[in-house]
Design a protein with these regions (language model features):
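C-terminal regulatory/interaction module of P-loop NTP-utilizing enzymes
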Residues: 1-163
Length: 163
């Protein structure tokens, strides 16, 4: 992204390898997003960040918003069940942060995948294993810890119910 720095300056132009100079349109708006904690992603270069007018870190939305969004996207109707699923997703995210488990992710996409999988399988526990736990970490020991510390206190192995 550092190669774009000259476009973000006041003069807003970049010279292509062909020698052609491209001028930035005066109404240009640049939006940059990244997940720096994801494997393969790097931190954004400070010189690039310095050229931004506004920098905002975005965390997971509140549980209420997560419930609303997940139900809207999936068509799920059981708000109590979805709220329990949101609690598990948030608790997994917290557990991973507190225990330095950084090789996976757990957020809205995992939640939505879990709800949709549960609709198909009618097995909330097994669906959690293949949509939430499996994405949170590849380490088998950490997965077992997530299952016993976070998943099973809310959803026992035998529980089967649609979202």
């Amino acid at each position: 992204m550092v190669g774009l720095n000259s476009l973000l300056e006041q003069t807003g132009s970049i010279t292509l390898p062909t020698g052609e100079i491209i001028e930035r349109h005066p109404d240009t708006v640049v939006v940059v997003t990244t997940n720096i904690s994801y494997e393969g992603c790097r931190r954004i270069n400070q010189s690039f960040i310095d050229r931004m007018s506004l920098v905002k870190d975005v965390e997971l939305p509140s549980p209420e918003i997560m419930i609303q969004r997940a139900m809207s996207v999936t068509g799920a109707t059981d708000e109590i069940l979805v709220s329990q699923m949101v609690q598990v997703v948030n608790d997994i995210s917290i557990y991973c942060r507190q225990n330095s488990i950084t090789d996976g992710s757990c957020g809205m996409r995992s939640l939505i995948d879990w709800i949709l999988s549960t609709e198909i399988t009618e097995d909330i526990y097994q669906s959690a294993l293949s949509t939430v736990i499996s994405k949170a970490t590849a380490d088998e020991t950490d997965r077992e810890a997530l299952i016993s510390a976070v998943l099973e206190p809310i959803f026992s192995k035998k529980r089967r119910k649609k979202a």
